[in-house]
Amino acid sequence: LIISISAISINTYAQSSIEEKVATLEKQLTTKEKIDLLCAKAPKIAHANITRYDWWSECLHGVARAGKATVFPKPIGLGSTWDVDLIKRISTAISDEARAKYHKALRNKGYSDRHEGLTFFSPTLNIARDPRWGRTSECFSEDPYLTSQLGVAFIQGLQGEDPTYLKTVATAKHFVANNEENRRLGGSATVDDMSLREYYFPAFQAAITTAKAASVMGAYNALNGIPCCANSYLLTDILRKEWGFKGVVISDGSAIDKLYTHHKYAKTLEEAAALALKAGCDMSLRDEYREGLRKAYEKRLINTGDIDKALKRVLTLRFRLGMNDPSGKNPYTHIPDSVVECSQHRQLALEASQKSIILLKNDKILPLKLNNQKIKKIGLIGEAFTSVYYGDYSGTPEHNTTLLECITAEVGQKAEVTWINEQVNDEIIPSNYLTRSEKEAYDGILGFTGEYFNNSKLTGEPDLRRQDLSLSFIPSKDKQLKDYQQLSARWQSTLTPPNSGNYTLTFSGSGNIKLFINDSIVINKTSNKKIKESFNLLLNLSLIHISEPTRRVVIS
């Protein structure tokens, strides 16, 4: 009898509308469980047949951080193509690979972890107005119209064309006027209404009204003094009432925490959570939001109606993605694993790369005239010709080609191609060129002798003495140093270069920094911000055992 009732229940549940499914599921959940589902890392709720799910996945220019994937040019390169059809074909390929990866995860373990899901935090629809902003390369363009057109195409390819089911969820970010690096977590953009509507809004408006984006991410910054993730004018008046948005608003990273830690717009986490929820922000990326909402509910800063309003939007997207749906009607469940970095997608990436290149100036040099015998040798200088740079938010392609390989193949036998690895980028000094003195080398002769003091002035005996193979680490994240109330340190070693020559040594860090070479001070800086200092040093191996010793390096 129980089996019969269960079978009828499932069949009815599968045939009912998404609205009915949401209403049915909502009634089964406690307030605590509802709050749990408003955080990106949503837990399993067994009695309601809800699987665990992490909303955080990235696909800026290909499925990112989930292993093998086709990697396309960064959005600033895609914007240079001015090709709407190409952008849609690219995002369609991305969503194919995303679906294949998601269903493989379900088959293997019954759920998807972070970066294995179907809810993607792309595209970035901010305006590329300032090259100093760290996320400029994530944007399509400095032009609102071009950004709008490419954004619509990207979203349509991600979400698919089925009237009921979403292929994946596209999240238009970061809403809005998010363009500043210096105060990125706590600054306020002062923007008049005309500039908003002519410059900052158009791409987001097109994403909602034309492409029907299912999700929007609120920005870290404030707009005219009110943080974007607690801004009812943006999230309710503009998004929902004016543009008709019915999807989920999620905060950028720890933006809700920043309401009280940076913006000082709220006094506590629970007050920040309440302000965000009531303004129209449905979900946060951070687990702290869960505790903030619980305390806000206990203190009656929010009520069940506020929670249910956000929950309905969240559950609606899960059902539109085909989760908890045994009907078999979802058209996107049978995309094979073989689409991931398939030959068609690699060819599409090549097409996009070729179309993204803009030649700004050519003094009759290109194309190289290889057939007239005037060019006999081509010199390529630097590691960029032998390294493949994918950019941030990237997958890991199994197939890639270096510039050296491309140029060599293109030139063929027409000229000689020579590559020189003239290192022009900073490189951590390998530990085999650094030698500790014998009395310090009880645990290894390579690298630096590090002496650490639980005070700020290198006074007294060191509290810790150890071997450090390099100085490329953050002391606050070091397990041996994390409990130090204050910290000062001294590192010593002898530097012996692989070859004679002029070397440029660079040191970067923050605080009070002194660097000595053979007892001569070469860096003496004090700053709370990052310090980066370089100096030239002549190292002649032929003199080491005659009149000039190896270079003794002391850093404090």
Model region roles, listed by residue range:
Residues 1-17:
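Bacterial Sec-dependent N-terminal signal peptides
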Residues 13-503, 518, 528-543, 547, ...:
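Glycoside hydrolase catalytic-domain context in secreted enzymes
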Residues 508, 512-522:
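Short, surface-exposed beta-strand/strand-loop-strand elements in extracellular ectodomains
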Residues 524-526:
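Solvent-exposed serine/threonine-rich low-complexity stretches and specific carbohydrate-binding patches
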